[in-house]
Design a protein with these regions (language model features):
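Structural motif
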Residues: 57, 64-66, 73, 89, ...
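A cytosolic small-molecule/anion-sensing beta-strand core signal
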Residues: 61-62, 78, 96
Length: 113
C-alpha cells in the first residue's frame, strides 16, 4: 500500500437522499479496513433513522452538520468532527453548502457473514 492524496475532484457523487450526496474515496481497493469519502449538502437535508454497523468519524470542512441520537443533538461546524460509535441510531442533518469527510471502520460493514 502507498501513501495517497485524497480529493473530491473527479469522484462520482451519488444522491443518498434529496439534498445529500456522497462520494467514496477510501475503498477496499485502497486500504485494509477503513472506508470513507466526501459528503455534501446541496440543500438543507436529513437522512433519518440510520443504525450504524460501523464506527464513524465525520469531519466538517465547511458549513454545519448535526447528528441526533437518543434525543440528543450534536452539532459540528467548520474544523470540528463528530465520533459516532457502532450500533448508534442516528439522524444526519446538514445545511445547504455543508461539505465534510467521513471515515468508517470496518469498510465491509454490510458484508454477509
Amino acid at each position: 500500500m502507498t501513501v495517497k492524496l485524497l480529493t473530491d475532484h473527479d469522484l462520482p457523487f451519488s444522491e443518498l437522499v434529496p439534498g445529500m450526496e456522497l462520494a467514496r474515496s477510501i475503498t477496499n481497493a485502497g486500504t485494509t479496513q477503513l472506508g470513507g469519502g466526501y459528503m455534501k449538502f446541496t440543500e438543507d437535508a436529513e437522512f433519518p433513522d440510520w443504525t450504524l454497523k460501523y464506527d464513524e468519524v465525520l469531519f466538517v470542512q465547511s458549513g454545519e452538520l448535526e447528528i441526533v441520537s437518543d434525543g440528543r443533538s450534536v452539532k459540528a461546524n467548520e474544523g470540528q468532527a463528530i465520533l459516532i460509535p457502532d450500533g448508534a441510531k442516528v439522524t444526519y442533518r446538514g445545511r445547504a453548502g455543508t461539505v465534510g469527510f467521513f471515515v468508517l471502520w470496518p469498510f465491509d460493514w454490510n458484508k454477509e457473514t
